């Protein structure tokens, strides 16, 4: 028997809820306020079937462009034929949560401003670029027991 090509195909683990989180949605999910221009993460709740986005958008971050009483309009960028296309989705509130993108970005900006201010006081130029992790420096490995060479050699017949 061939496999189906349904709308929710291959989402058994993707939409599964974590251990001890099954059941109804918490009330705080509904009481969260969203404003136009905020960043949100689309996280599909498998127990709520209405207003569920397509599986490709699970885990994506988007920008709110419309707020309705029970759903939110989100702009998500998707790659189609090698170019980014702006997709506008209407997702129910159960499948959306506030994103930490702005908080992480603002923390980085504050750290960069502080580093620049300290560099100006010291008269040095500070690079604020994010560099990948550098390789570790060379270290000489020593054994736990110091090896002693034999002092007397004799022929073995």
Swiss-Prot record:
Chain intervals for the UniProt region annotation (Disordered): 110-132
What domain of life? Eukaryota
Biological process (GO), any one: translation
Gene3D superfamilies associated with the record: 6.10.250.3260, Ribosomal protein L21
**GO MF assignments:** structural constituent of ribosome
Entry GO terms, CC: ribonucleoprotein complex; ribosome
Q: Which InterPro entries match?
A: Ribosomal_eL21 (IPR001147), Ribosomal_eL21_CS (IPR018259), Ribosomal_eL21_sf (IPR036948), Translation_prot_SH3-like_sf (IPR008991)
Disulfide partners: none
Which keywords belong to this entry? Answer: Ribonucleoprotein, Ribosomal protein
* Family membership: Belongs to the eukaryotic ribosomal protein eL21 family.
| Xref: PANTHER family | 60S RIBOSOMAL PROTEIN L21 (PTHR20981)
The protein, known as: Large ribosomal subunit protein eL21
What organism is recorded for this protein?
A: Tetrahymena thermophila (strain SB210)
């Amino acid at each position: 028997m061939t496999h189906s090509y349904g709308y929710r195909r291959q989402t058994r683990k993707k939409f599964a809820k974590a251990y001890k989180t099954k059941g109804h949605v918490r009330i705080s999910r509904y009481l969260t306020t969203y404003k136009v221009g905020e960043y949100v993460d689309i996280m599909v709740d498998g127990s709520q079937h209405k207003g569920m986005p397509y599986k490709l958008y699970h885990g994506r971050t988007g920008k709110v462009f419309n707020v309705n009483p029970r759903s939110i309009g989100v702009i998500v960028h998707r790659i189609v034929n090698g170019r980014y296309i702006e997709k506008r989705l209407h997702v129910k509130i159960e499948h959306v949560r506030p994103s930490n993108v702005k908080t992480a970005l603002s923390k980085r900006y504050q750290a960069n401003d502080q580093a620049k201010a300290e560099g100006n006081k010291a008269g040095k130029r500070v690079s604020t670029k994010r560099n990948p992790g550098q390789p570790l420096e060379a270290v000489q490995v020593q054994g736990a027991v110091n090896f002693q060479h034999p002092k007397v050699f004799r022929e073995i017949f």
